[in-house]
Amino acid sequence: MDKYNSNVKIHKASHEAVILRVYPDYSCRHYLAGQYGSLGLISDKGNKFVKRAFSISSSIINSDTRDLINQKDLNYYEFYINRIPISHKGREQITPKIFRLKDGDRIFCGEKIVGHYTYQSDNHWQNIILIGTHTGESPNNSIVNYLLLNKLNINICNINVGPDGWISSYKLEHDILEKMYSNYRFIQFIDNSKNYNMLDQFFLDFISNNNEATKKTEFNLELNSTLIMLCGDPKMIGAPIKKGGWDYEYPDYGLINISKNNGFTIKTRFKGGNINYESYW
């Protein structure tokens, strides 16, 4: 199809998720770690173009050479996509079509890359905790890659949340990084509750500097020196809901609620803060 402008390579695949490397016909654009692009495919009936935004991911390190990946040297974009139940209601889904792709298939990859879920060095952070549900790990991995590549003196804890049986497709890379970098910690957090009750309790313990929690993260969560980054399920995040103008409603659930109650503030385009988030499902 004329809309297609990129080739697909399946980097890793399981029943639950797939890592695609998308090689565009055009030169890859520079982007900030944590931002998102878009992928598109023609509908099954051939009469509609289905497009959706996806965060750009990163394998962080070459597992064979042990060299950190530098996105500026790449001729592809990497996407980490979670399988979702097929819905026959509402707009057509692109995800089931993505899971049918094979090496060499064509796809649309948008040239525009945007997003505010990025690491800003406007504060000399000593610690960063990144929490993502399922493939919400994608932008967090890109940010970890940026932090390690630039040799920033910062403690990093990267937490991936999922139910029993969920394992990050990047587990090998995380294991290698933990052995190579004393300031890097990856936690595969299992939470089978409907509303992330187990994660909430862990985070509450962590924010209270409970010994058991800080043993896992390997640093204390301190108000003036720690950046919190949250990506994925809105229920996990508890993001504020815009009511109009500058009026927001803050849910009484989620990690933002816990953080705000302990003095942390949300970062926006117009003011600084130590919570950054991006909700999607």
Residues of each region from the PLM?
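FAD-binding FR-type
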Residues: 16-129, 262-266, 270, 274-281
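Generic beta-strand structural signal
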Residues: 12-13, 230
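FNR/FR-type flavoprotein reductase catalytic core
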Residues: 93-281
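Conserved positions in beta-strands of structured domains
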Residues: 6-11, 57
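Generic marker of residues within folded, mature protein domains
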Residues: 10-12, 46, 69-71, 148, ...
